[in-house]
Amino acid sequence: MSILKIHAREIFDSRGNPTVEVDLYTKKGLFRAAVPSGASTGIYEALELRDNDKTRYMGKGVKRAVKYINEFLAPALCNQDVTVIEQEKIDKLMLDMDGTENKYKFGANAILGVSLAVCKAGAAEKGVPLYRHIADLAGNPEVILPVPAFNVINGGSHAGNKLAMQEFMILPVGASSFKDAMRIGAEVYHNLKNVIKEKYGKDATNVGDEGGFAPNILENKEALKLLKNAIGKAGYTDKIVIGMDVAASEFYKGGKYDLDFKSPDDPSRYIPSDKLADLYKGFVKDYPVVSIEDPFDQDDWEAWSKFTASTSIQVVGDDLTVTNPKRIAKGVAEKSCNCLLLKVNQIGSVTESLQACKMAQSSGWGVMVSHRSGETEDTLISDLVVGLCTGQIKTGAPCRSERLAKYNQLMRIEEELGAKAKFAGKNFRHPI
């Protein structure tokens, strides 16, 4: 079925910044997709096109990206004899029209908006759920419900506190189903709120961009202590493990790391990568930490390889790999990490996201699907994680509607699958 009409507009993300939304029409109806936006972005991500007009939205407008869709991509796709089922063909057409390596001409936010809408329309055209359509595109006969990684303590670039490390997550791997994992996660979240309130006062329970609490603590170990305490109080010590996103590129300075980077600069406190690695090993020894994302800077390749070789935990590449096949290939060759963080807007199309996922999985890596800190109510990544069978997703705390929208969609999918629903659980790293 051919595309009848495509219309893009500016909408707002969860931080009050403009982002791109695309409406795509076929004979089956309207299919709408919205594009997320990150705060701690890797320098190798595909280009997110902003207007840079300082008189409007502090330069963050996306009128140019919207214009490129409405005036270039839309007419080209509506005039093509392609059906919305042909995801790869449509994505390739847009990539060829852009003609640059990092989507410099139209912007990844323009191409992705259309690509996501096409994916939704393709599922409707086939008369199957979106997760099944994505599984078909990826060549997966089965589908799997993921373990949610709830980001319940926010630091780094996501919060106004002194905490350097960006995310402290709980993963209910001992749950019996996705719905059960949600209940466990929510109960720990509420226990954590009480633990923080008792120790630091009510102000400390304000939340960050992803719905996690942002108490004004400096010591990263203190965040882990708070988590351990809340997990124990909720009664789930045997069912929950901990994950972290350090986002170390945010505090990498001149070859070293500044764990107090939000304070006035003082080079005497910077530490080298091996000292930082020792800190992580201490966390793993003292707490149930099983996953660490971006432990080092995106170009500190040697530190990555050294650390990954020395540990059995999951080491996740985000800023390092930016969902980009070339960076993933280098990471595989150098054994830099053992898990890919998959963010559709880092690469900028559904087809390339699927290719990145397949590449990581075929290299023996795990894959974790991820939201961005600037999110919308769009829930496509919920269907994506189920269809790609990655076994793990991070999309914030069980708080803030743009986060819950994804988790609620996953509960609906599990309900729809009924007896056929498989939950990744303790096999979240390699669920297939």
From Swiss-Prot:
EC top class, as a word: lyase
InterPro entries, A to Z: Enolase, Enolase-like_C_sf, Enolase-like_N, Enolase_C, Enolase_CS, Enolase_N
Magnesium as UniProt keyword: yes
A biological process from GO: glycolytic process
UniProt cross-references to PROSITE patterns, sorted A to Z: ENOLASE
Stored SMART domains: Enolase_C, Enolase_N
Gene3D superfamilies: Enolase-like C-terminal domain, Enolase-like, N-terminal domain
Cofactor(s) needed by this chain: Mg(2+)
Subcellular location: Cytoplasm
GO cellular component: phosphopyruvate hydratase complex
Protein purpose: Multifunctional enzyme that, as well as its role in glycolysis, plays a part in various processes such as growth control, hypoxia tolerance and allergic responses.
Stated name of the protein: Alpha-enolase
Protein source organism: Thunnus albacares
